[in-house]
Amino acid sequence: MSEPVVLGIESTCDETAAAIVRGRELLSNVVASSMEEHARYGGVIPEIASRAHAEAFVPCVSKALVDANMTLADVDAIAVSAGPGLAGCLAVGVSGAKALAWAANKPIYGINHVIGHIAVTQLQFGPFPKDTLALIVSGGHTSLLHVEDMPRKIDVVGTTLDDAAGECFDKVARLLGFPYPGGPHIDRHGQNGDPHAIKVPMGLTQGKAGAAHPYDFSFSGVKTAVARWVESEQAAGHEIPVDDVCASLADSVATVLARKAMRGCRQYDSNTLIVGGGFSANSQLRAKLLEFGENYGVDVRIPQIKLCTDNGAMVAMLGVNLVEAGVAPSAPDFPIDSAMPLTKVSM
């Protein structure tokens, strides 16, 4: 069988994206973001995002085909993010993808957007080893997964009990007065600060709580501790050392993620850790994971920055996995699922 060619379409939040992947080769990757339209509101406004998807859908898909020097007839299947995400945004992408699939008589796969974040690493590092661990870190998800057989069997090893890592960063960013999105600002300032200047707690790593939740995450306490420290310094009339706050926060969160990921690798006898999600673009986290991986003898696979944030390549790559595994396409009338569980790879 020749390598499958899949058109991937993404519209879960504020990026409209389309890409074409053949096997493990990325042929095109087009992204249109409405982020600037949301910045004035301090977060994504679903109605604005949905309208932006409707406007960008056809141009993105058309450019992806042109860039790959293909027509829709050359594509073997279409994959589209069916969840999790904002319902209105998902509806635009899924409706458009269904129309294309019907018009071109192509099979369609409604895929799990979050699993796509780890699938995309194959474009850079090749196929998944069997029985590997995966760390997903994004604005809405922080989870450790056991990927026994991609894409057929994926289990959740640990997950966040409250705020995800990205949410923690966004909330602290607002506290420090950074514009939306705040994560990149914390990353940039953190590179110039002292990571040990401020004592930031490491949730669920010690005592009974740590023993009871060896692979779970909790970052709400981190956010609260940083907020209280900043407020106390402001009350005392002290200037806030923004770079140090950012560096200390990033170091704490990155250390927790790296420790628990390595513990999971040891427990499941895996010498490979797959990392994905928008938060994996954070420079401190990338450095910490690579450092821990070297110390533990674990091959840490983190995709290049442009493949960390939402894109069509990750959707197309997961679509390729499903086609190769012989998984049946989704029904033509499959629904969106804004709360799609991580154990469900496709609809």
Curated annotation (Swiss-Prot):
It catalyses: L-threonylcarbamoyladenylate + adenosine(37) in tRNA = N(6)-L-threonylcarbamoyladenosine(37) in tRNA + AMP + H(+). Gene3D superfamilies: 3.30.420.40. It is found in: Cytoplasm. It is an enzyme of class 2 (transferase). Its cofactor is Fe(2+). Substrate binds at I136, V137, S138, G139, G140, D170, G183, D187, N282. Binds 1 Fe(2+) ion per subunit. Its main location: cytoplasm. One of its GO terms (molecular function) is iron ion binding. One of its GO terms (cellular component) is cytoplasm. One of its GO terms (biological process) is tRNA threonylcarbamoyladenosine modification. PANTHER family: TRNA N6-ADENOSINE THREONYLCARBAMOYLTRANSFERASE, TRNA N6-ADENOSINE THREONYLCARBAMOYLTRANSFERASE, MITOCHONDRIAL. Required for the formation of a threonylcarbamoyl group on adenosine at position 37 (t(6)A37) in tRNAs that read codons beginning with adenine. Is involved in the transfer of the threonylcarbamoyl moiety of threonylcarbamoyl-AMP (TC-AMP) to the N6 group of A37, together with TsaE and TsaB. TsaD likely plays a direct catalytic role in this reaction. This is tRNA N6-adenosine threonylcarbamoyltransferase. It comes from Bifidobacterium longum (strain NCC 2705). The lineage of its organism: Bacteria, Bacillati, Actinomycetota, Actinomycetes, Bifidobacteriales.
